[in-house]
């Protein structure tokens, strides 16, 4: 994997950790990895590389507010690394975040640092498969900078149908038998 940009969002040690961590999390049921981050592309390349190495059908969806902040862009690093298992989306971050939650088995968040609790509630409410969430907390970057959670979908019990009894109308006409006496 080749990361072309000189700007590094995370240290080399943290990069190795996230690569190994995600690679270990990927299993045969993993379809999509959602990355919400600062658009330097370092983690995008790492996630795409881990996914490509472990399960070639796994796709990385990378979203950010804008995609031209850094040069060279993440797409250039992905292209030179021959990693084509990615989708890069920019703009309207909140909407894209909510749309892509349902598609992801693994979510990496390096954004929303001050509102992570509300974003976790959105994740809990919208996931449809068990999902692993990795949050990079820059305040803990001297230690292990990642907080990991697993969120399972809430399965609501289905309402049971009440047994309905159907009553057939009863014919209430009474027939009287009259006996005729014969003499």
Describe each region flagged by the PLM.
Residues 3-8, 12-156:
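S-adenosylmethionine/decaboxylated-SAM
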